[in-house]
Amino acid sequence: RDGLLSHFAVHLSPVFYVLLPFYKLFPRPETLLVLQSLVVISGMVPLCLLTRAFGFTRPQTLCYGLMYCFYPAFMGGCFYDFHENKFLAVIILWCMYFLETGHFKSMLASAALLLMVKEDAPVYAACIGLYLFLWKKQYRLGAVVFLASCAYFCIAIWYINRFGEGAMINRFDNFISDKRLGLVSMFKTILVNPA
């Protein structure tokens, strides 16, 4: 990747279009870094709402908020890097807030936005679907979220393989025991040899 290329040749991240109007007004790298920082810190809103929904005290909420703000993986990267993964935490927190408070239409909208972050973000949405299905006993909704996430994952990988430089599955090499099966082998490894 030592050359100019479209981000969509490597990752499927349509969530970046949310930032486009602001970047159009101020087309500078600093704009993207500031917007990214605002996105990350905005995760405090669903986090505080979640703590309130679970009945935590104000000191407990403050403690969770401080942990979120000072966790290096969240805020540290905002000082030097622009990356789509910074959208994950805030959107997942909104999904969980809407899920836990029974606002399922808003949860579905948040889950759809989550799918737009990156080609592998459907893994998180699929886990939310499993949580809905197994723990919340929302069988139909959980199945829809899980299956839609799996379908989107397949479509996103197909898109990158067809129109981009191909999915970067080499990060899963430790899990792929049979190279002929590709990613399917990863699931076999997880089931047969999870350690």
Q: Model-flagged regions — what are they?
A:
Residues 3-28, 189, 193:
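Short hydrophobic/aromatic helix or loop-helix immediately within or flanking a transmembrane segment
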Residues 25-26, 38, 54, 70-74, ...:
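Transmembrane helix irregularities
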Residues 28-31, 54-62, 101-107, 137-141:
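Membrane-helix interface segments
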Residues 46-50, 66-78, 86-111, 129:
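Specific aromatic-rich, kink-prone transmembrane helix
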Residues 106-116, 120-134, 141-148:
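Transmembrane-embedded, aromatic-rich helix segments that form part
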Residues 138-195:
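Membrane-lumen/periplasm interface segments of specific transmembrane helices
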